[in-house]
Amino acid sequence: LMEALRRRDPQARFTFLGGDRMAAVAGTAPVVHYSRMAYMGFSEVLRHLGDISANLRTARRALEEARPDVFIPVDLPSFNLKVAKTASKLGIKVVWYISPKLWAWKKWRLRSIRRLVDKMLCILPFEPDWYAANGYDRAVYVGNPSVEEIDRALARVDVYLQQESDEATVEV
């Protein structure tokens, strides 16, 4: 996503929570590295509640200081809905990339989405219709980066196979 934004606007500046690849694109370090946010399971989250709270405070403070044109949360609804609330209070547009899977669980979060999220960018083609049927009409399908990467890889395999003999073997 950051690479695509950078191509559209080479002067774009990023304040972000993420990893090394994002840092390379942004040309700056993350406010919080994702390795300090990667907690799964009830007991692990419980053990790191202090870190999670500190990360949340850091994210909110970064929004207040940077005052970006747009806040783009990616998935992680438990954390990002709280940050989106801060962004919304600051008058910062919220454009969510990779919709939380509300259709599978925690549909009640839709109330917050309606209130806080200006645009939902979905990677599954049925999601905009699901959102519309549930009273949120600002969701759009933007394609799935994983599928697009697989398509590019398959295209490279096709080219390779066309160049090789009939006995070419491809291992996946």
Feature-to-residue mapping (PLM):
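Active-site and donor-binding regions of nucleotide-sugar-utilizing enzymes
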Residues: 1-164, 168-170
